[in-house]
Amino acid sequence: MISLESQVLERHLSIFADKTLLFAGGVNDDFPVQIQKIAKTVTVWSWYFDYANAQGRKSAVDFSPVCDTQVDVIVYYWTKNKAEVQFQLMQLLANGRDNQEILIVGENRCGVRSAEKMLSAFGDIGKIDSARRCGLYHFRLKKRPHFDINAYWKTYRNPKLDALTVYSLPGVFSADELDGGTELLLSTINTHIRGDVLDLGCGAGVLGAYVKQQNPQARVMLTDIHAMALASAERTLAENRLAGKVLASDVFSHIQGKFDLIISNPPFHDGIGTAYRAVSELIKEARWRLKEDGELRIVANAFLPYPDLLDEHFGSHQVLAKTNKFKVYSVCA
């Protein structure tokens, strides 16, 4: 099954015939694989490790914050994260060929209609199809934008983080400020943490870096599926002179060993909707990833049904802290 966006692209197969192609943005299906039989070459640039890992067995994949691959046609899948879209498109335009051809496709509810406004200063753009509640735009590059990744880095500090400075790139959760859920979870972290600590779904690395800052004796590992999050977490650790391992993993897919503490502010948004797959997998498998007497500590929106999941797999749970919006849950192996 292919996405709505890919169904629209499927109506324009002649554009792809005998061309070198780069798929980028929010592409998340097998359309790049299907198109291989008519294209000259197909490369995928994805920021999402779960998708990149799956596609890597079928086609060439670039899992990285940056991409300098040059092709005949770029196929960009619009996402709802405007900062992420702008970062990716400006980079693609800056690295594109003369008269670079780009197809931009996306669901209307994700804001694809703003493609014309974003790109019109750099070339000719127009809508060529509208179907499946999606828009498809054709763009031809005339003027390259200046792109400097250093201009996209953001930093912030917060009294709740002591002297920690957080570094983040576009597309990373809570890139501009400390979010309420993470702040509540931070309030439960003390200076008595020992052993191996896993920050799962680390984002810019706030939780893992704070644990290491407050507990230098702890060994921390930070993981995420998002390329920009991993780059941000690495810099947050480095700039604060904190030691830690940063690893790409889809929940526990590429994590080895067991931990004394697993902490997480797990995402529950998947695209436009809400999804619990990652959180369900986290809670289900955490029991086998904890050392004896190890602890899983997560923060979540209070309305989410995590207590039932925790009780199902651990027998019981504790609420360590709560506000009107969030709760911090703790379970032990």
Curated annotation (Swiss-Prot):
SUPFAM superfamilies: S-adenosyl-L-methionine-dependent methyltransferases. Gene3D superfamilies: Vaccinia Virus protein VP39 (3.40.50.150). The keyword Transferase applies. The keyword Methyltransferase applies. It is an enzyme of class 2 (transferase). Its main location: cytoplasm. One of its GO terms (cellular component) is cytoplasm. Pfam families: MTS (PF05175), MTS_N (PF08468). Its EC number is 2.1.1.172. Keywords: Cytoplasm, Methyltransferase, rRNA processing, S-adenosyl-L-methionine, Transferase. Belongs to the methyltransferase superfamily. RsmC family. Monomer. This is Ribosomal RNA small subunit methyltransferase C. The lineage of its organism: Bacteria, Pseudomonadati, Pseudomonadota, Gammaproteobacteria, Pasteurellales.
